[in-house]
Amino acid sequence: TCSTGTMRPHAEALGRGRDRAAMIGPMSPVPHPSSPALSCDALSGDVVRLEPLTPGHVPGLRRAAEGAGPNAFAAVPTPDEVEDYVARSLARRDAGAYAPFAQIEAATGRVVGHTAYLTPRWMNGGRLFAVEIGSTWLAPAARGTAVNPAAKLLLLARALEGWGVDRVDIKTDARNEAARAAIAATGATFEAVLRAWQPSLAPGEKGLVRDTAMFSVTPPEWPRVR
């Protein structure tokens, strides 16, 4: 059983009176800058299971990637690119500050996509106070289903209740209306369009920067979102 670390007061309040173990699973250690890897066990719900990414997920991700791209605004691998994509994700994980998952449809056991924690931020070298959910893509058959919102809830629960962060970022290319609608549907709050915020991930836009639509969830909003 993983240790929980010290929970923030707001995280204790959010979980009080309600058994959240079924949602957030066994607790991983709270990340700390002295050991900043965003390690996390599998997260399971009724709709989707998020398994820490391994090379064993490559065949399933290849099938999930069939017909998934090219995406107009995001980096989605083709089936032939999946093996290298997984290798890069695992290299980022091993370097710290990145925790990739394979998304598994609970009803069928099929791999239907990829998602991750990234961009951790530390309070004056101390506790983790913010993290991002991103690097998300889904097989065409899983888009528009309950998989994406269910996965987001699992990740939000672990970050807000388990790690006790003060903020979770979710962002997308400002031009991606479908992704913006999907993020808003999770209950995340739209904050702003950040101009020229980061390099574009859109095909054919290497070397260009994009405007980014920024959303977030904070502890006071979590009871409504969950």
Write out the residue ranges for each language-model feature:
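Conserved GNAT acetyl-CoA-binding A-motif
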Residues: 161-171
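GNAT-family acyltransferases
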Residues: 23-145, 158-162, 197-198, 203-226
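Conserved active-site alpha-helix within GNAT-family acetyltransferase domains
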Residues: 176-192
